Amino acid sequence: LDYYGLMHRTQRLIAIASVVAGLIPFGSAQAVAPAPVTNSDLNAGLMYQILVAEMSAFNGDETNAFSLTLDAARRANSPRLYERAVELALRVRSADFALEAARAWQRGFPSSKDANRYILQILIGTNRLSELTEPLKRELQGLSGKDRVGTINVLPRYFQRVTDKALAAAVLEQALAADLPTTLYGPAAWSAVGVMRIGAGNLPGALEAAQRGAALDANAEEPAVLALNLMDAKAPAAEAIVRKYLTGNALPEIRMGYGRALIGAQRFAAALTQMQLINTQKPDFADAWLVRGSLEIQDKGPAAAEKSLKQYLSLLPAEQDPNDETETGRGAVQAYLLLAQIAELNGKPDEANALLQRIKSPQDALRVTVRRATLMARQGKLDEARAAIRNAPERQADDARTKLATEIQLLRDYKQMSEAYTLLTTAVQTYPDDNT
């Protein structure tokens, strides 16, 4: 018998039992100033029961540990013991036991948000959606103002993994019945219902939810965001909700979302107007300058686009040492590529090359190399251009094929037909199944 090992394990279990019982705060590894003495509700018998429960859990008998812990929780009316009972039940994947403990916890502490969230998680995890109405109502109990709106907004996330999305939408609508007709909470509540209806594939129902939410308050953000999502889902009537919202004191993020939706619909002039409005209303909103510059290349010309793109870059955090290998952000990559394109159009290949060299992005490395190689070829440096392409790192599965195709095209563009044919023959032998 390993006496010292047994004593060490027993002392550890006593410590765990004390923490679970709430006698010792978590993380109390060092001596601290004495706290005021408070009498524990636990007597010696309950302490012994908790210790036995922890020993059972330590030895793999979680079922017995659960029963002992739940009994102790009821007798001591201890939130920490109730939570421990839930944890033990979940450890053995017993949803029924976990739900029993969580509901007992809630009966003992009706206002406990932790107990209610365990109940929600267990019911959702076991697809017992019809039992969720009351727990959802309790999640909102006692909340008002922004706290209530914020909680309503996150409720749809609880249902991301449920299989019956239509039932989930109906349950949430029932739980929010008291909020739906109100001016203060109705827009958020209807939008939450609309999000659930989108998940269920009910686009007409989602549009109705957006319309009802906006009817309560046309300046509310939630129906406008829902309507934006419906625009992406090809529901044209949703645009009227967004446009009405944008006539007020609109958030730039929502106007930006509308602009992107317009770009997706190839309504570029309208999208440019939205970007210009953001630039006027909130000049430090960087992304609007980037999108504006991207649109102006096609519409207003290189000079206007260059000004917008440089304004975008000026709003980003200051660049570090040029030798710093910190990866360039996605927006900055796009801006540098567009500015390099403008420099090429203006007949400034050296400036274009310098802009491309500022991009430090592994995923764009080949793309940037191809652009730089094209610049070299235009300056009569075809051999250097080919060498740059061949030496470019290969990070994706198709990069080798892309490099070969790019080099062939470069040779064709500069009338090196013999070398292009030789390289094409190599490509056909290397990639016999490639019909491109």
Language-model-detected regions and their locations in the chain:
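Bacterial N-terminal signal peptides
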Residues: 15-25
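A composition/secondary-structure signal for short, hydrophobic, low-basic-content segments
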Residues: 4-7, 26, 45
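Short, intrinsically disordered or compositionally biased N-terminal tails of bacterial proteins
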Residues: 1-7, 323-324
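Alpha-solenoid helical repeat scaffolds
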Residues: 37-58, 67-436
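Bacterial N-terminal signal peptides that target proteins for export
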Residues: 5-17
